[in-house]
Design a protein with these regions (language model features):
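Short glycine-rich, Thr/Ser-proximal phosphate-binding strand/loop in the N-terminal lobe
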Residues: 2-48, 140-167, 171-172
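Glycine-rich phosphate-binding/hydrolytic loop that grips phosphoryl groups
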Residues: 229-249
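Nucleotide and nucleotide-moiety/phosphate-recognizing core
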Residues: 42, 64-65, 71, 76-80, ...
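Phosphate/pyrophosphate-binding loops at sites that engage ATP/ADP/AMP, CoA/4′-phosphopantetheine
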Residues: 36-51, 73-74, 197-210
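Adenine-nucleotide phosphate-binding core of ATP-dependent small-molecule kinases
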Residues: 173-210, 217-220, 228-229
Length: 249
């Protein structure tokens, strides 16, 4: 059994999978915020972990904590792999000027989207602490993308003071022309996010291009998008799982 870990900027997500089963078929899964990372030890202690694959964009401190927990669970270093972007993996060709500079989470998301929608032109949008918008060609070539502050990050940066700290969980009730500062911040941030996604989608110049939406803020942005899209949960974990299978699909 293989433990897949997506260590993001805000949360740590994980899933247990069997490489002999269908990609994305989880035997167990969960997620915690960084402050609660120690709690995964109890959950993982009940699992039969033979190998571990980690995508980490959360920094060295989180990497150290993860390794410490795995050592305490008697998982040998030889069984641990840190997933990183490369020139090519699992049907995705990375056209970044320096392929290894692409974030491991973005690369895994592209692999996950490619696996789910093989042979289709895609716009892969992940909505978390940052919003990333990446273009994937039908042949699996990642041609590039854009990064902007995520919905909550953008809203927080515009807060006038703590009393007006915007709550993005009310984004589904936002009006374009708000009659108060709190809602005006939410409206502006939503418009910026949706506008970036729409602009990127228009640049694909293909009516058959598919928009794939993932991440915690996807539920708030989706209702405002004018184009069809598919919401896919845990795209990074799906990509990590697919990467283990190589080019088999």
């Amino acid at each position: 059994m293989q433990l897949l870990i997506d260590a993001g900027n805000t949360r740590i997500k994980w899933a247990l999978t069997d490489i002999n089963h269908v990609v994305g078929e989880w035997h167990a899964m969960g997620n915690v915020v960084h402050a609660d990372l120690g709690k995964v030890k109890q959950a993982w202690s009940a699992l039969k972990i033979e190998r571990v694959l980690i995508s980490n964009v959360a920094g060295d401190a989180v990497a150290w904590q993860l390794r410490k927990i795995l050592v305490e669970l008697n998982v040998p270093d030889a069984s641990l792999t840190w997933f990183r972007a490369q020139a090519e993996c699992a049907g995705v060709r990375n056209a970044y000027a320096q392929p290894t500079q692409l974030g491991s989470d973005r690369f895994a998301s592209l692999i996950g989207a490619r696996h789910r929608y093989v042979g289709q032109r895609l716009l892969v949008v992940t909505c978390g602490t940052a919003t990333t918008i990446d273009a994937l060609e039908a042949d699996g070539t990642f041609i590039g993308g854009m990064i902007l502050p995520g919905l909550a990050t953008m809203a927080t940066s515009l807060a006038v003071n703590t009393a007006l700290l915007p709550s993005v969980d009310k984004a589904d009730r936002a009006r374009v022309f708000a009659d108060n500062t709190h809602d005006a911040i939410i409206s502006g941030c939503l418009s910026a996010q949706v506008g970036a996604i729409m602009y990127a989608y228009e640049q694909r110049t293909d009516p058959h291009a598919r928009c794939v939406l993932s991440g915690g803020a996807a539920q708030y942005l989706g209702p405002y998008l004018p184009m069809p899209f598919d919401a896919v949960d845990n795209l990074v974990l799906l990509g990590l799982d697919a990467s283990v299978r190589g080019d088999a699909y």
